[in-house]
Amino acid sequence: MVLIFGGAYQGKLTWAVQQYGLCADELCDLAHGFLPGKRCYYHLEALTRAAEEPVSPSLFPADAVLIAREVGSGVVPVDAADRAWRERHGALLRQLAGQARTVVRIFCGLPQTLKS
């Protein structure tokens, strides 16, 4: 598994497509729902926002490329539902990072490998 994360509009998907040679039919935009059997899943934050319970890392294939937005950056949301989502999303990212063979942070389109 590969985990790619970073802020909004930092070039995460573009970098992943180039780095891993991904085609459009291998991508699943989780903002529009989950499709099994894809090679790359992006917008993990949309999946954790829609879920009422924690998302299990086992939902994704072991060789998947997963792309997630950093949320919060230390800012605590005023709304309780937003705080709960931020906590669910952060917990999922910690679990995925622990299981992933590679973890990359993208900032301004530049990759920073945290784990390989």
Task: Locate the predicted segments by residue.
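Histidine (H) residue identity feature
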Residues: 32, 41-43, 89
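Glycine-rich P-loop/Walker A and Walker A-like loops and their local beta1-loop-alpha1 context
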Residues: 1-30
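Residues at the C-termini of beta-strands that transition into short coil/loop
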Residues: 31, 45, 107-109
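Conserved P-loop NTPase "ATPase switch" module shared by AAA+ and STAND
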Residues: 36-50, 66-68
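A short acidic, often aromatic-flanked loop/helix-cap motif at beta-alpha or helix-coil junctions
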Residues: 32-36, 111-114
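Flexible, charged surface loops at secondary-structure boundaries
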Residues: 21-22, 33-39, 58-62
